Regions:
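Accessory, non-ATPase domains that flank or precede helicase/AAA+ motor cores in DNA-metabolism machines
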Residues: 1-278, 282-284, 288-304
Length: 305
């Protein structure tokens, strides 16, 4: 049997390998490439190559895999943003070949003192509004002034999502990944958040990546690149400060993380909540055209900024 393996490199096509393993589409496998070993993903199976061509063999199958929904999203992301599909895969699996065989302990998220918070009437109404769509794809905008408790509303929604063994992704502009947000998260959930951004160490990235693909990490708070991580059971995406211009990446792989988050939620068939004090022009137009649902909260919530 032959298999097409996509590599996380600047290629717009997969490579054909002989396969004696029982590999499925989405399996991460080790393959020879030039003089090195590389980690790639089985993209297609039972692919017949013309005879009389020397084809190398898949070395081994790893314990990791990505699902068809993510594969479809990668293909769409590549086409929509005009980026080689191998580069998109690199954003998903990173430098996996450098750490996939390292036996790390699971990431340990420090437990903290948990505080009790009660939603006020307006926040409770907003939560119920957001929950109307249950577990299907939906884009809802939660708008509120600073200090109105928008964060508490989506924390409550996340709490219900992860109780069903699902995962949640909270996207924030990197500048907002502050100690203040971390403290609020810890006060509500009783443990420190797993955080993904450009400045975390390679070891921390390795542990988080494995925790995400194994469904050991239930909530990830991250900058824009986090939206391409291989979540095992993603249940909701929150885009906080959706109006912030830093969601647009202008160098390297060019994309708008807010828009791509909405698209990923569509492929996953899960809800996405856009959180803002003042909606962006694009979001405002989608609200006006009834493509996005919209709710406002006004009252200041003094106990929880």
């Amino acid at each position: 049997m032959k298999a097409q393996v996509l590599l996380p490199k600047v290629f717009n096509f997969p490579f054909t390998y002989n396969s004696k393993i029982k590999g499925k589409i989405g399996n991460l496998v080790e393959v020879p490439f030039g003089s090195k070993k590389e980690i790639g993903v089985i993209w297609k199976n039972n692919y017949e190559e013309p005879k009389n061509i020397k084809i190398k063999e898949i070395s081994k199958k790893t314990e990791y895999s990505i699902d068809k929904k993510l594969i479809d999203f990668i293909e769409w992301f590549s086409s929509y943003n005009m980026v080689p599909i191998g580069l998109v895969l690199k954003m998903v699996i990173g430098n996996t070949d450098k750490f996939i065989n390292i036996k790390d302990d699971s990431i340990i998220l420090k437990k903290t003192e948990k505080k009790n918070f009660d939603l006020n009437e307006e926040q409770f109404a907003a939560l119920k509004f957001l929950e109307k769509t249950k577990n299907k794809f939906d884009v809802s905008v939660l708008q509120g002034t600073t200090g109105s408790g928008k964060t508490l509303v989506y924390f409550e929604r996340i709490k219900k999502i992860i109780k069903k063994n699902n995962q949640a992704l909270v996207l924030l502009p990197e500048i907002f990944l502050t100690n203040d947000f971390k403290s609020r998260f810890e006060d509500f959930f009783g443990f420190e958040p797993a955080i993904w951004h450009s400045k975390i160490s390679p070891k921390q990235k390795r542990l988080i990546w494995k925790g995400i693909i194994n469904n050991k990490i239930k909530i990830l708070v991250g900058a824009r690149s986090a939206l391409l991580l291989p979540f095992k059971k993603l249940g909701i995406i929150i885009v906080d400060e959706e109006h912030d211009a830093s969601y647009k990446q202008d160098e390297g792989v060019i994309y708008n993380a807010r828009d791509m988050a909405i698209s990923r939620a569509n492929f996953e068939r899960i809800p996405v909540n856009l959180v803002t004090s003042v909606p962006s022009i694009e979001t405002y137009n989608n609200i006006k055209n009834k493509k996005y649902r919209h709710i406002k909260i006004f009252k200041r919530f003094d106990d929880y900024p």
